[in-house]
């Protein structure tokens, strides 16, 4: 919840870390000041301004009269207000960065990880709401690392860890962005080591006899139990198989692996 996200703010502020979990509004309008934060260099100088926009619920956004998509258009309007507020603070040589927890048009979602964000009749927002004054847009929600529209300055860094078996082949990383004044000088990707492996056996669903043979042939190195891989087993069935788990566990007997999920799909026999 927004309140839970902001609960540790007093502690985190001691380390110059800031959490913005919700939008505050009053009769006078939105509190744009809390959405626009200075980013300081080691010497204390402000090097950039950040539009720290949290996930926006329908009740968080401005009401747009005669809007075709009230929620999406409200989000875009609030971003425009916050960006203009940041531009008013920005001085020469300072970059402008925007954050967003949203699904932009053209972004690729995982098979079974992200919650679907439905914005009125549309599911995605246009990247055009970030105009050329915004030097870099750091996006969250989609777990696959990706650029939007082929623009390296509008991107999802992706999840640093796999959050489902569908993300096994994703590049899990942290993206570091360097600026020279207001100019983006370098974007570097740093892979996150994976301490526990995820396995899919087989890589594509197969019949039960093929799956059991593959599990029996599974050759894994011995390691501490806390480092055993998590395993997803993928089986094609023609009818329900009551002893499916028993057969799979028997094939895995004595192997250093943790059975996390059995995925079944049905085909006509």
Q: Where do the language-model regions lie?
A:
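Conserved beta-strand segments of alpha/beta enzyme cores
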Residues: 18, 49, 153, 186, ...
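Short, conserved loop/helix-junction motifs that constitute active-site signature segments
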Residues: 91, 128-133, 225, 253
């Amino acid at each position: 919840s927004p309140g839970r996200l902001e609960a540790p703010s007093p502690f985190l502020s001691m380390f110059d870390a800031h959490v913005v979990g919700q939008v505050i509004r009053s009769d006078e309008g939105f509190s744009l000041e809390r959405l626009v934060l200075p980013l300081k260099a080691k010497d204390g100088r402000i090097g950039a301004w950040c539009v720290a926009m949290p996930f926006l619920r329908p009740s968080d956004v401005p009401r747009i009269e005669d809007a075709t998509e009230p929620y999406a258009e409200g989000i875009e309007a609030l971003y425009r207000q916050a960006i203009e507020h940041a531009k008013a603070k920005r001085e020469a040589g300072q970059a402008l960065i925007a954050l967003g927890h949203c699904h932009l048009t053209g972004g690729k979602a995982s098979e079974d990880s992200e919650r679907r964000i439905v914005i009125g009749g549309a599911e995605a927002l246009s990247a055009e709401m970030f105009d050329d004054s915004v030097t870099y847009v750091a996006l969250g929600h989609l777990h696959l690392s990706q650029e939007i529209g082929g623009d390296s300055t509008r991107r999802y860094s992706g999840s640093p860890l796999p959050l489902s078996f569908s993300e096994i082949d994703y590049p899990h990383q942290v993206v570091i962005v360097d600026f020279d004044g207001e100019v983006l000088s370098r974007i570097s990707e740093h892979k996150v080591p994976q301490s526990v492996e995820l396995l899919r056996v087989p890589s594509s669903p197969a019949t039960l006899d093929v799956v059991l043979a593959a599990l029996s042939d599974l050759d894994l190195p011995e390691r501490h139990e806390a480092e055993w891989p998590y395993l997803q087993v993928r089986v094609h069935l023609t009818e329900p198989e009551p002893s499916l788990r028993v057969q799979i566990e028997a094939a895995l007997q004595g192997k250093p692996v943790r059975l996390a999920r059995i995925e079944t799909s049905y085909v006509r026999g």
